[in-house]
Swiss-Prot record:
Binds 1 heme group covalently. SUPFAM superfamilies: Cytochrome f subunit of the cytochrome b6f complex, transmembrane anchor, Cytochrome f, large domain, Rudiment single hybrid motif. This is Cytochrome f. Keywords: Chloroplast, Electron transport, Heme, Iron, Membrane, Metal-binding, Photosynthesis, Plastid, Signal, Thylakoid, Transmembrane, Transmembrane helix, Transport. The keyword Metal-binding applies. GO terms for biological process: photosynthesis. It comes from Welwitschia mirabilis. GO terms for cellular component: chloroplast thylakoid membrane. The keyword Cell membrane does not apply. The 4 large subunits of the cytochrome b6-f complex are cytochrome b6, subunit IV (17 kDa polypeptide, petD), cytochrome f and the Rieske protein, while the 4 small subunits are PetG, PetL, PetM and PetN. The complex functions as a dimer. Its cofactor is heme. Its main location: plastid. PROSITE patterns: CYTF. Component of the cytochrome b6-f complex, which mediates electron transfer between photosystem II (PSII) and photosystem I (PSI), cyclic electron flow around PSI, and state transitions.
């Protein structure tokens, strides 16, 4: 009988532990997926609008800087680095989905010209592989190999993201030409303020939905508040729900106006985008340039020799 009770207890413990782990995983996954390229991939056919704006800015409302470094020109069918830099102060903490504070994650989208794509592993040099680390890049969609996304990844470790890029060869891809091409990049640090469905995250400011007096502030067991605002002139009251994370700025008895902030703005991150240019260089043009430069150098050498020969002749005539 004692053995059976022990078995039942162990069974219940295993089931309870599994349930807790499952819930924790779902919360963590929700926290991660609610902020980064997965939303753009699901909601937008292209990450760049006709106006030139990258769609990540629709959810990450604060503007921050981002940088990109690419070679001025590349040869066809060659691997090069596109380095995206997402600078921020690593000492700051952001509000997580559960209302607690934690480090910032980063994400990036790299929009390359048609024909450019992520370099296959066997074409990447050991030096570039070391810079990449354990990063896992994705195509924006199966048909858009020239658009790469990554994130969320720890910003503490990856404020610089190295994309290994393979340039196209016009000899095999007729739609590609030797010319200058634009590159677009967007990068964010921290979570977004708005979800694609228009709802707010807990990483933004919450405003009063009505004008009136704050009659009650109820602190919820799992964090957050219910703020009751009484509008005496209209004889009604509204309840504004504030999730865990933002800090409350009002107290009971305060008079507030519609759209007045009830909380601070906890967001410490933001999104930025920048453009760059790269030239797909024709190797025969480079060879022609080298031949031209060599001919110029040789011409200069011959001129110097001819000048010295002429000076010797003049000197000999003067001595004669």
């Amino acid at each position: 009988m004692e053995k059976r009770n022990t078995y039942d207890w162990v069974t219940r413990w295993v089931i309870a532990s599994f349930s807790i782990l499952t819930i924790s995983y779902m919360i963590t996954w929700t926290s991660i997926s609610n902020a980064y390229p997965i939303f753009a991939q699901k909601s937008y056919e292209s990450p760049r609008e006709a106006t030139g704006r990258i769609v990540c800015a629709n959810c990450h409302l604060a503007k921050k800087s981002v940088e990109i470094e690419v070679p001025q020109s590349v040869l066809p069918n060659s691997v090069f680095e596109a380095i995206v830099k997402i600078p921020y102060d690593t000492q700051i903490k952001q509000v997580l989905a559960n209302g607690k504070k934690g480090g910032l994650n980063v994400g990036a989208v790299l929009i390359l010209p048609e024909g450019f794509e992520l370099a296959p592993s066997d074409r990447i040099s050991p030096e570039i592989k070391q810079k990449i680390g354990n990063l896992n890049f994705q195509n924006y969609s199966p048909s858009q190999k020239n658009i790469l996304v990554i994130g969320p990844i720890p910003g503490q470790k990856y404020r610089e993201i190295v994309f290994p890029i393979l340039s196209p060869d016009p000899a095999t891809k007729k739609e590609v030409n030797f010319r200058k091409y634009p590159i677009y990049v967007g990068g964010n640090r921290g979570r977004g303020q708005v979800y694609p469905d228009g709802s707010k995250s807990n990483n933004t400011v919450y405003n009063a939905s009505a004008t009136g007096r704050v009659s009650q502030i109820l602190r919820k067991d799992k964090g957050g508040y219910e703020v009751t605002i009484e509008n005496i002139s209209q004889g009604r009251s509204v309840v504004d729900i504030i999730p865990p994370g933002p800090e409350l700025l009002v107290s009971e008895g305060d008079f507030v106006k519609v759209d007045q902030p009830l909380t601070n703005n906890p967001n410490v991150g933001g999104f930025g985008q920048v453009n760059a240019e790269i030239v797909l260089q024709d190797p025969f043009r480079i060879q022609g340039l080298l031949v031209f430069l060599a001919s110029v150098v040789l011409a200069q050498i011959f001129l110097v020799l001819k000048k010295k020969q002429f000076e010797k002749v003049q000197l000999a005539e003067m001595n004669f």
